[in-house]
Amino acid sequence: MRVLIVGAGIMGLCAARALLRGGHEVTLLEQGPVPNPNGSSVDAHRLIRYAYGAEIGYARMVAEAYDDWETLWRDLGERLYLPTGTLLTGPAGAPMIEQTARVFDRLGIDYAMLNAAQVASRFPVYAAEGIGTALHAPSGGVLLADRIVRGLVRLAAAGGVSIRPGVRVAAVDPERARVILQDGESVAADLLVVAAGPWLPRLLPRYEGRVTASRQVAAYLAPPERLRAAWRIAPMLLDSSGGIGCYVVPPAAGTPVKTGDHGFSLTGDPDGDRAVAPEAARAAAETARRRLRDFDDYRLLYGRACFYTVAPDERFIVEPVGRAWILSPCSGHGFKFAPSIGRALAEAVAGRRDPAELARWAAGLMPPDAS
């Protein structure tokens, strides 16, 4: 079968890899270079963790995700993942922490509850002030995202995927599995896959309101030299205090410390200027002030803007439309599942998986005891 994929980010590349392995002839269209620095998935790191609050469906999917990443590491010949563990902090009774603990109990995932003093003692890069409760899990870690994307591009090219960079799609016809390029060229296939990230509503207006482009700013920090050894044992941090909370990514494999908040801007133009003003970078860094010990000793390196594609309930949209599949598994938590979603799509295309079941699974809505 001839398959045409729009978008060469992590989802498009994982779909291409899985469909190629299924024996299909795959063409990949990308509006920019490949990898595209403006893609949602092209950054130093992304996180994988079981901690999902009450969302047991997504927590269950993480085990599958780890298996699929292992398959990819074998194909790549390198493991682009660093285990860090996961630390949740928040005020006493924080719903995210209590719900995560209940889900972990149900799924048999190892964790320990910590108090503020224990957090500061075990992980001296983090400050104890303001912590009412904490949960630490040894599972979870950092996916080296930009290196993964480059590796997937190499695999796709070596496997025979036709990659067309610098090709902007003007219109999509899912019923005919056809696209019209900005220069007027028509490209058709037997099956169309649209993995266009924040550009999806422009290509398919029916998704206006179902997903919204959201400009997000992260700050990248250089830790003080005296804390570098402590950072080597520090877990990723998800903090739910102070309103919208913050995240902190350890400086894995030579990358900086990364931080930002959990809020969605729900604004911005993905074709707009990606430059981050110094004050915006400082604001993103400040989200971690309450949680990073000796915060003022960190040096702000830069800020970076990327775009999430946010659904109102933060559930992934993976669904067939005519002779096309729409892949919009984002809302800021999709990267970890990309190889699994690519595999599941290939199974559905081969008739081995029910499309409706796949859509429910991707939305995190499968029963917790489903096999």
Language-model regions, residue ranges each:
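C-terminal catalytic lobe of FAD-dependent flavoproteins
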Residues: 287-371
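Core beta-strand elements of the Rossmann-like FAD/NAD(P) dinucleotide-binding domain
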Residues: 1, 182-191
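N-terminal Rossmann-like FAD-binding beta1-loop-alpha1 element of flavoenzymes
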Residues: 2-28
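Glycine-rich FAD pyrophosphate-binding loop
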Residues: 21-41
